């Protein structure tokens, strides 16, 4: 597993069990990215955007950037 996906797995596990349920996971081949969408019990939506080119994982909640992690 790549370092980027290992970091994503850690982030995903930090949200798991806190009311978030995975809805979809897809690859955006044109932009060299992976996208994981989750939904919370309260209706909030979370999206992980994993950019393979820049090595940045972005976390959006309800369309607003909440956090970014850049691998070194």
Language model segments and positions:
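Short, non-transmembrane alpha-helical segments in secretory-pathway proteins
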Residues: 1-21
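Short, low-complexity interaction segments enriched in Ser/Thr/Pro/Gly
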Residues: 6-7, 61-63, 67-69
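Short intrinsically disordered terminal tails
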Residues: 1-3, 69-72
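Acidic, low-complexity, intrinsically disordered interaction modules
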Residues: 15-65
């Amino acid at each position: 597993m790549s370092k980027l996906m290992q970091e994503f797995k850690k982030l995903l596990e930090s949200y798991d069990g806190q009311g978030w349920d995975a809805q979809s996971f897809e690859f955006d081949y044109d932009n060299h990215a992976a996208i994981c969408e989750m939904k919370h019990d309260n209706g909030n939506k979370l999206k992980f955007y994993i950019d393979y080119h820049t090595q940045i994982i972005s976390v959006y909640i309800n369309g607003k950037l909440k956090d970014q992690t850049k691998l070194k």
